[in-house]
Amino acid sequence: MGISRDSRHKRRLTGGRYPVHKKKRKYELGRPSSNTKLGSKLVRKVRCRGGNLKFRALRLDSGNFSWGSQNVTRKTRVMDVVYNASSNELVRTKTLVKNAIVTVDPTPFKLWFKTHYGLELGKSSEDPQASEKVAALVPRTLLDQFSSGRLLACISSRPGQCGRCDGYVLEGEELNFYRRRMDKKKRV
């Protein structure tokens, strides 16, 4: 039958049917959603209108994530999908979509921090001055995540359209908001 993005098949406000006076057109076509899963990388090219290409990611396992307050971006491994405002089904099936909250591997950021500041992240050092310096640079909530080995991040690209899974590390108010939402879900 084919997925169509027309409105001829819709009913009127009163509930009556519209008379269908023309067939489906090529420019109204829709495609099934990619539902990008967490796994080894698999990206397919899709030819679109005007000869343009879309990159349909079927499986992804890594992406470029930026740490906004430190102004650094690193390629890192996506470990898990933990929250999605759209649907719990997308969390259960580990589907990567825009604005999904995922956990990423903090190792690349730890290495950068070590080379840039000369300080260890996530480890409680014996030197109190070093730990004070780290505390001044990185908020407590982020330090806890670095020590646990799982950073919360948000996907800002569209994996089903561009074939990439890029995003940013959650910080500040946004991190607190999503933490509260996840705690609320756990309690229910």
UniProtKB/Swiss-Prot annotation:
The keyword Cytoplasm does not apply. The keyword Ribosomal protein applies. PROSITE patterns: RIBOSOMAL_S8E (PS01193). Residues 1-34 are annotated as: Disordered. InterPro entries: Ribosomal_eS8 (IPR001047), Ribosomal_eS8_CS (IPR018283), Ribosomal_protein_eS8_euk (IPR042563), Ribosomal_Se8/biogenesis_NSA2 (IPR022309). GO terms for biological process: translation. This is Small ribosomal subunit protein eS8. It comes from Theileria parva. The lineage of its organism: Eukaryota, Sar, Alveolata, Apicomplexa, Aconoidasida. The gene is RPS8.
